[in-house]
Amino acid sequence: DPVDSGTSQTRAVTNSDGSLTITFDDFDPGMLAGPTSAGENLYSYQGYPQVTTIYDNTPEEYLFLSMFNTVGGSTEYSSGGIALSNWNIRSNQSGNTGDWWYSYLNQCSVYNTAVEAEGQNKEAGHSGSSFGVVYGYVDAYNQAWMAKPEFYFNVPRKLVGLWICNTSYTYGVITYGNQFGSTGVATPLKEMKGYFQVNLECYDANGGLIRTYKRLLADYRNGQQQVDPITTWDYWEINAEGVQ
């Protein structure tokens, strides 16, 4: 949920200092991931009208725009992108077992414990019900084919901060692990003495890299200050003195 908002209004609003707050709540609901929290409509082969682009036209046209990456001629969420969502499932629901709630089958849910009644798909965003789910990573297996998820503004702007929260998928895998790790056995990140970091790259209007900001989502490495995964929305300040 980019940039702080002091209200629960469902609009991208102009603040008193001239800055804009994007809440994701005034996006067209037809862009929402569904019909389940797996986000089947984010893929071309699931039999639903596919969503590949999300954008905000309030108060300006294409104030915010993000499109899924196209790899090998196919545009899919699995190739990297930002999905619009309001799902908030943090445990197995009726009929689900095992690691369902922290697998790709629940990849569009936010792990926001400030909402006591999970699964109602409302009020789980920072400023309302909706939020963006960022999917994209680089490792030894996919760096040759997955592009980085991107978002754009309609004109050059200074981004001052983001409200971030883990997805259920991310939180669960950090906490419990899954079989896709190097050992093939579900191992919590803490036991592996590992870390998980997100990088935010900022570019100018000509596509030149201005700066990369880094945020640790979890850190259990020896000799490092322990960082546990967040469970509510947390402000990530950037473009400020002393912020790395």
Task: Please give the residue ranges for each predicted region.
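Short glycine-rich beta-strand segments
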Residues: 164-167
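Extended extracellular/luminal ectodomain segments enriched in beta-structured repeat modules
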Residues: 154-161
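Short secondary-structure capping micro-motifs at structural edges
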Residues: 145-151, 183-188
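N-terminal targeting leaders for non-cytosolic proteins
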Residues: 6-147, 154
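Terminal, low-complexity interaction segments
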Residues: 192-244
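Short coil-to-beta strand junction motifs in C2/discoidin
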Residues: 173-198
